[in-house]
Amino acid sequence: LHASNAAVIDGGTITVKSSVEALEGTNVTINGGTLDLYATDDGINAASTATGAEIFIKITGGDIKVEVGQGDTDALDSNGDIIMTGGNLAITSTVSAFDFDGKASYTGGTITVNGQTRTEITADGPGGGGAPGGQGGGPGGH
């Protein structure tokens, strides 16, 4: 699913069984719904070449499963920020759960990566970014 600017999911059921990038836009907001995404590259991708573009992935609700293939892949890849305030995010990835160039904020919801609970969002893949002080967003702003 590709949006040239904002991709906003407010509800419903979305299943992507095979894709290169399952859900992408300049910014991606998931407020609710059930998403089951599989990608051979990035599961959810926020990127833009436009100067000054507001680039982010924001999850406020929903039940989201993201599985990515092997290689240089990221479950969530943002050229800006990753923000999570609610919802349930279950990631299956052999390489990288999160890759971001901005900051990470995790104040609510649940995150599991390969069945293990995460208490913060950290860039963990090859070339994993995160601006200085941007890594380690955890519940309660930690």
Q: Where would I find each of the regions flagged by the language model?
A:
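A composition-driven surface/loop motif
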Residues: 1-142
